[in-house]
């Protein structure tokens, strides 16, 4: 088979199963409204949960820092790219979340890959929730460690897997809030089981940080867990982009030596770090609390109004509200029907989710109003299916 035949066959297979992904060009993609092809839609696909991507204080912080530092960092943090803005943000994050150290990464994907790649060796074992993010599972598959996956949020299955003999070290991997199901992991129980078996715990709290817990400290704080490795990302609740790993002093020093994604990547722009510090200040303030409370009320309003006889609504109380429709083509038709009525929603299909669980992944944000939720419910219930 030639290279071209391999490429063509893969694309043909995706088209045949209604799983071919496509991108949409938008002129505004975050906030209450999405604008595409000159038309305005209510936006139910954004991860900007607290509406901070449009916050004037955060925008101003980035602009001022860009004037001071320029628009790029100029190099890896190990060469010339670790500025006072990066240092200040790392210290603020560590203090806020109660860890000795924080290390910044250019993305959550890079952070997850870096930690697992740097830590795991031959004869080690990774025990990951089967619904863990692609960045975690890919890193686990590529590492020299053995990967075992436990049934989603099933702590008994996790315990059984950890009990089986392992010559090396064991790492338990889970998420705080799951990106496709919107539910949360039983983190306190998972942590207890991990420690009983002398395993470390890595939690990716991309969708919980900033949005849940006291001062927005996230799912671990809310549920009483403190993993050895906490990954937080800044493209959701923070409204910006990037990520950080929270850990001990020694683990931070280790990652600075052996995390190739960190050592060999240009660091985030200092202006971005400054904007993230401004975002953190909003998250921790009374305004941040009010934004979280408004979002929670909108989620409750939506869940109370969904017609459960027509859609499978998962037990999710986060900003992520998936409606399971099962069939790929039906999910695509439903997303298109919503767009025709001015509501932008995304159909999620395999391989992102298991076969037979195609869904509309609806995301609610603080930028929405109650009337937006009511409109979404009206359109959903009127969609001709």
UniProtKB/Swiss-Prot annotation:
Question: Pfam families, from UniProt?
Answer: Aminotran_1_2 (PF00155)
Entry keyword annotation includes Transferase: yes
Q: Pathway membership of this protein?
A: Cofactor biosynthesis; biotin biosynthesis
Q: Which InterPro entries match?
A: Aminotrans_II_pyridoxalP_BS (IPR001917), Aminotransferase_I/II_large (IPR004839), AON_synthase_class-II (IPR050087), AONS_Archaea/Proteobacteria (IPR004723), AONS_Proteobacteria (IPR022834), PyrdxlP-dep_Trfase (IPR015424), PyrdxlP-dep_Trfase_major (IPR015421), PyrdxlP-dep_Trfase_small (IPR015422)
SUPFAM superfamilies given in the database record:
PLP-dependent transferases
CDD domains per the record? KBL_like (cd06454)
Q: Name one GO biological process term.
A: biotin biosynthetic process
Gene3D superfamilies recorded for this chain?
A: Aspartate Aminotransferase, domain 1 (3.90.1150.10), Type I PLP-dependent aspartate aminotransferase-like (Major domain) (3.40.640.10)
Q: How does it assemble?
A: Homodimer.
UniProt-recorded name of the protein? 8-amino-7-oxononanoate synthase
